[in-house]
Amino acid sequence: METKTVTPLARIKPSDAEKITINLGYVDLGQIDLLVTESFYSNRTDFIRTAIRNQLAVHGEVVKQAVARKMLVLGLQQFTAADLEAVRRAGDRLEIRVLGLAAIAADVSVELALETIGSITVLGALHASTAVKAALASRIR
C-alpha cells in the first residue's frame, strides 16, 4: 500500500473558534482592564487576540519555514467519506499534516478511517466523532 502526503481535498468554514483558558496575575489583568477602560481595546478578548497576532507576526518567518519543512497544510482541511473512499479505491493511505483545523466528517465510519488514514499530525484542532478519534488515537501525533 502506497503512503501519500495529503493535499487539500476540500475547504470548510469553522462553525466556531476554539476556546482557550489562560491564568493571569491580578496586576496583568488589571493593566489589561485599564487599557480597555482607556479605549485602547474594546474588551479583554480584543487585547488578547491583538497580543497573540502581534507575537505570531514577530515569529512569522519561523512559522512559514516550519510549515514548509514539515509539509503542513495551512488552514482548514476536511475529509469526507467520499474523499476517503477515493483514497481507498486508489490503494493509498493518508499521512495528514495540518496547521489549523483538520475535520473528519460525521459520515466517515471507524472502519474507513482506519483503512485510509496512516497518521494524523494536527497543530491546532482535530474535529471528528468520538468513535473515530478513539479508533485513530494511536495514529494521532
Task: Indicate where each model-derived feature is located.
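N-terminal start-of-chain detector that recognizes signal peptides
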Residues: 14, 19-21, 72-77, 98-100
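Short amphipathic alpha-helix starts
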Residues: 17-34
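Short, positively charged interaction helices/loops
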Residues: 57-90
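Short, basic amphipathic alpha-helical segments that act as recognition/interaction helices
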Residues: 3, 7-13, 30-34, 42-66
